[in-house]
């Protein structure tokens, strides 16, 4: 199965892979046709930007314009794991990933196979494996049904927690939590007491 997954990614296809939150629909981020394929599969509006799934701090530095002092500590303390970090995008981030926004989100999923595929193929997009606007399937079989068996991937239901990732915005002078997930503000402060938080804005 792994060879089939790699072949699908290589040719610009999309595959279902587990993360620590939910299953994602992964494809090569720097391949415009592959990203377009994911948008069409998910029926996702084109103005909804995508995150870059990366494998290291070096990848984050390679695609971001600003690197605040707390970035390295956040990566060391919480990644790989359920944290999305938003930074200013540099000109290496293609417009088809971040919809021409000035920022881009970074994820580093902790599933070992998913992370290894990111290392092998470079940055991948990986939005939740569902039809846009519908609930995400909680099992691999449900996801296959959602996509009429037209996708392949790796089944590992036991790895998923179903909890959201926390989204933290480092693109401004103050740090904002845009969505509270399994990593809390208190968790972050315990590791990085000096982090310059702004007022918390929870997206429910």
Which residue ranges define each predicted feature?
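Active-site-adjacent structural elements in enzyme catalytic cores
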Residues: 1-204
């Amino acid at each position: 199965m792994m060879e089939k997954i790699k072949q699908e990614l290589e040719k610009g296809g999309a595959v279902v892979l587990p993360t620590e939150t939910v299953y994602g629909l992964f494809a090569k981020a720097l391949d415009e046709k592959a990203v377009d394929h994911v948008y069409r599969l998910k029926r996702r509006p084109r103005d909804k930007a995508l995150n870059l799934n990366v494998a290291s701090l070096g990848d984050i530095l390679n695609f971001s314009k600003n690197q605040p002092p707390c970035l390295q500590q956040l990566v060391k303390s919480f990644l790989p794991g359920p944290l999305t970090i938003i930074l200013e995008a540099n000109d290496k981030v293609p417009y088809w990933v971040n919809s021409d926004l000035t920022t881009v989100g970074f994820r580093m999923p902790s599933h070992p196979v998913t992370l290894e595929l990111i290392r092998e193929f470079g940055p991948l997009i990986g939005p939740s494996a569902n039809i846009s606007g519908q609930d995400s399937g909680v099992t691999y079989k449900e996801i296959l049904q959602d996509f009429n068996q037209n996708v392949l991937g790796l089944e590992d239901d036991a790895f998923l927690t179903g909890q959201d990732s926390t989204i933290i915005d480092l693109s401004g002078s103050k740090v904002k939590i845009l969505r509270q997930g399994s990593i809390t503000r208190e968790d972050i402060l315990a590791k990085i007491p000096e982090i310059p938080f702004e007022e918390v804005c929870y997206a429910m």
